Amino acid sequence: MSEPTVAPRKPHRITTKIDWWRAAVQAAAVSSSASPGKGTPALSTRMPMPANGPLSTSTREGQSTRVHILDDPMPDYGEHEATDDPLQVLRHSTAHLLAAAVVELHPEAKYGIGPAVQDGFYYDFDFGGKSISEADLPAIESRMRRLAQADIPFVHEVLPRKQAIEEFAKRDQIYKVELIHDKVEGDEVSVYRTGEFLDLCRGPHVRSTKDLKAFKLMRVAGAYWRGDEKKPQLTRIYGTAWQTQRELDDYLKFLEEAEKRDHKKLGKDLKLFAVDDRVGPGLPLWLPDGATIRRELERFIVDEELSRGYLHVRTPDVARLDLYRQSGHAQLYSEYMYPPMKFEDGEELELRPVNCPHHIVIYQTELRSYRDLPLRIAEIGNNWRYERSGTLAGMNRVRAFALNDAHIFCTPDQLMDEVKGAIDLALYFSKVLGIDEFSYQLSTRDDVKDKWLGTEEQWEDAQAALAEALESMGQTYKRGVGDAAFYGPKIDFQVRDAHRREFTNSTVQVDFQLPQRFDLEYVAEDGTRKRRVMVHRGAAGAMERLFSYLIERYAGAFPTWLHPTQVVVASTKDEFNDYAQEVGARLRASRVRVQVDTRSERLNRKIRDARLKKVPFIAVVGEKEAPAGHVNVNDRTDKQVEMPLEAFVSMISAEIAERRR
């Protein structure tokens, strides 16, 4: 499955001195001389001022202006803001175009927010009770194209706060008024006009609607205003936008292939898992074939961890709320925790959102010596976390999940080796499971101090340890400021699903906080008691999320060792059913998962049904194979080989044992 690609070009950089008395010079004035022989392309600018904007923004002597020519797909100025990417600028401008079209077609509509997102954009609308569906999208898109062809400029203005509120109030745009009150600081408000349409926005934008040529509206969804379930539910319209029609066409083809691989679709088609409203959203049911795959994954994970010195334990799914008060989760993680179960005697029990407090208690069941360290406690433990219904997605984001979790208790001088060992284990799991493309993110804290436990020095030490571990292993990484856990920084292994959405699959975290909160000590070699360090790690992540990734990675055609049905034995006629059963029994004796198809159906039908289930091998038996004790083996490439039954048993047993892909 190929993704649409755009060949990168070197960004054009322009330095120009503008006389102070010409303060009204537009940023667009320099664009024609900057364009390398292609006329005047779409552009955006960045300026050191509160509101960025390309057309109506003036510049003063001593200020610098950056012009992004939009035939440069990915300029790199060493910054990471979304507006530094001209493709994001184009998509954000297309979101404004969408809102302008909606307001023309539905004057009563109230518009919320419309950002650029990965591969596209969206805008949230309140249609006043009117139902809007995907059947309405062609008309909206048609109006967008009419506005685009009208060559309407994006005009940036800075209004006094009072005037901005009045402008939106007279349009009855209550959500924009609310945003000004809640989000905009100071006495000036940055807005953009596109014809009669007015939006609250910092920019930047393309020069004109005429620069928006390759876009398409994709789907409609519901979304609570500002992500709050207590606020009105709005209609969210998603779209995509690209610089050229060819890139748009490539992207749409990519989506067609991604849809075929979507784990929610394949999970239903292959009968791997189900979701039922009677059970509840985000609470998937593992069906027999899905549960078989999960057992294989867990067996593989546990066996490898045991071979690396981990001790596997079992702990309960609930604990007293006081345990999570001591760990800090009740104070700093409560939005993801379920309400406690309260009893008449005053006891409060909590569904656990994490496993670490339980493993800490196991550590404290006896006095530990330096000889006991490092102590690696592991578990595939059930966790329960509240997620808003709008964020739930198949198996990828759920409310109940089983986490491949471990906590390593070690001395400070053992820390580096343990972090590197955890990274190595995650790499090994990725190699065997076929997670070929991933990236590292070093997730650190931000400056909001009440979100984090511990001192700045402790955080710096922990972050340095993780960075050093990655660098010593030759791994590159990016930083995710503000993405750390509340008790410490972490390394996140980021992977992408079939739709290129990024998510965290594995983590390694260094924690100096919980050892302090739980007074975790060990007896050192000199007989004194010392504080130990704790490493949290989830080398394979949650079983549900890993499962969703593997479904899409293999499009349901799992490697033989993972597939719930490794062989289908198909008889050509009823008279060979007894031999088919013998073949099935021999395979089962070698711990091969097999189904014997003795239905009174044509052989082509039996093969077709096995192919739909993406079974790795089909062993056909008939008048030629039965007397000789052979099987005719068909694999997923349609390669056919007749061989003795024992040779086939040896071949498939080796493939399963070696976990070949």
Regions from the language model: what does each represent?
Residues 2-5, 9-22, 27, 31-38, ...:
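Low-acidity, Ser/Thr- and Arg-rich intrinsically disordered low-complexity segments
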